[in-house]
Amino acid sequence: MSQYEKLLLSILSGTKDKGVLFADLRAVLDRLGFQCRIKGDHFIYTKDGVEEIINIQPVGNKAKPYQVKQVRNIILKYQLGGDLHEV
């Protein structure tokens, strides 16, 4: 299992929302094909075919837990995680 798959699995499992590094969350969104634009410390992600806009901000080097949950819900809703979305 690759590092990306392990990271995606930990996000989808929902057991470590407080421990997800901001850079890791960004890497997952980039790998899933989201486009990023940055305004200050706001990282705004969009993707064709996905209605929602994802807006994330770092707290130190971590991602905010509620934003990790929002990303997880979008991945599950649109089945973006490949075979891993069935966690």
Q: Predicted segment positions?
A:
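Basic nucleic-acid-binding interfaces
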Residues: 2-39, 48-87
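Major-groove recognition helix of helix-turn-helix-like DNA-binding domains
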Residues: 42-44
